Amino acid sequence: MAQPSYNIENVYRAISTINGYFSEEKQYGATIQRTDPIIHTYCHYGNTKGKCGNYFQMASSGVIHLLKKLKGMSGLECDKLAEYAILWLSYKLAIKPNNNGIDLNHFYTNYIIKNNDYNKKIKNDDSLTYKAIIDTKKDFMNIKEIYNFSYLFSILFYLYNVNNPNNLKCTNNSNYPENFANKFKELNEDSNINGNTSYRKLLSTLSDDYDNLKKIYVNNKSCNFPLLPQIEPKKSLAQNPAEISGRGFEQISGQTSEVISSSSSISTTLIPGLSVVSAIPVFLGIAYKTIYKKKIKKNNEENEN
């Protein structure tokens, strides 16, 4: 696979920086929110004064911060910017306590379209807006498969932010590289994914990022990085793409058990001091179970009525 023209480590370093601008977690029954004042920069909805009112508005602002930071890097085209932004966004939504079932499509409608900052022309590029960048991958917003990719992203995000890669004991942490490789193989063989050009490109991006990790962990003998299969285009055997893209968050809730099952292999053992990505081990295993249990319960109650 061709080596990307941009610095992958700098990309994940930038994502880590933006990720640290705000967080929310449950502690002893209380919701603790931590924010950096900079996160309020891009929160202009209607006639508001520009201060983010909730976690989702902060996530929206964070996406612009990330796009702005990545856009200054050499070799990153708009579609690649959108890929990383949406991967990070889906991760950030999934780890939020009490997400209330807000998915990417809902987020796009309420926190991107309605955020005035997305439609402002980007400095030194009068023909482009941040919304236009996101729209290059808008199809990711309404399809369940993006959450499978987010599982892969969460592992990469964790591994790229380990303070000392040579000290990470992969055998004590459910062997993240092997988990990545197994899930990658599964997605690569899924006709819903390998039959879609955009998804194959995203698999290629994650594959490049994974291969780059091998160089970082080359001296760590406990971390085995299996070879990833070649990404081969195949004819999709899935239903009409329009039907897939039209399915909402609740409609796909019953189909996520496989994702939840595979995610449970991520260990809850953390590297001391790794606060930036401390939520990653529960990324799917807890956050998704909580979200989807509520959704399934709601659906069952509606069906009974």
Regions found by a protein language model. Give the residues of each.
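N-terminal targeting/regulatory segments, especially signal peptides of secretory
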Residues: M1-Q255, V259
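C-terminal single-pass transmembrane alpha-helix
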Residues: Q251-N305
